[in-house]
Amino acid sequence: MPKPPDYSELSDSLTLAVGTGRFSGPLHRAWRMMNFRQRMGWIGVGLYLLASAAAFYYVFEINETYNRLALEHIQQHPEEPLEGTTWTHSLKTRLLSLPFWFWTVVFLIPYLQMFLFLYSCTRADPKTVGYCIIPICLAVICNRHQAFVKASNQISRLQLIDT
């Protein structure tokens, strides 16, 4: 059981008002048991989720504008391309014709990869950081498969000695 702080030795009133800065409880014990990388990982996860909430709000506001622009684009009759049309206008019309789910998938994959990387930083074992990123995951799986094949080949070459 933690000992209550002795306020008789505190000299200034601010320290007396705030206390010693030591908190007790399971959350504080868990926080103290983590190393620096894990703490920064959890702070990163929290900030990432907070920024994600703000970004999702912004995206859904843009979704209404995107739908309106896409509908305007579809409702227009296809006209012959004007010679004064710039490549940026042409690119904009082609990108607007892509469905919203396509843009969702394009942005969701890197989003999940970043989230899973930050989450992997919260693990106690530093060797497991980054295993959830797709290229690293594929490399680990291929390496394990090659190691398994190599080990099974070595085992098959061993001669059993019957005594």
UniProtKB/Swiss-Prot annotation:
GO CC aspect terms: Golgi apparatus; Golgi membrane
Transmembrane segments: 40-60, 98-118
Compartments, as annotated in UniProt: Golgi apparatus membrane
Disulfide bond entries: none
Pfam families xrefs: TMEM251 (PF15190)
Lineage: superkingdom: Eukaryota
Coiled-coil stretches: none
Keywords: Golgi apparatus, Membrane, Transmembrane, Transmembrane helix
GO process terms (BP): lysosome organization; regulation of vesicle-mediated transport
Membrane topology annotation: Multi-pass membrane protein
Primary localization: Golgi
InterPro entries associated with the record: LYSET (IPR028024)
Known role: Required for mannose-6-phosphate-dependent trafficking of lysosomal enzymes. LYSET bridges GlcNAc-1-phosphate transferase (GNPTAB), to the membrane-bound transcription factor site-1 protease (MBTPS1), thus allowing proteolytic activation of the GNPTAB. GNPTAB is involved in the regulation of M6P-dependent Golgi-to-lysosome trafficking of lysosomal enzymes. LYSET is thus an essential factor for maturation and delivery of lysosomal hydrolases.
Subunit record text: Interacts with GNPTAB; this interaction is important for proper localization of GNPTAB in Golgi stacks. Interacts with MBTPS1.
Family stated for the protein in its record: Belongs to the LYSET family.
Name of the protein: Lysosomal enzyme trafficking factor
Organism: Bos taurus (Bovine)
Gene encoding the protein: LYSET
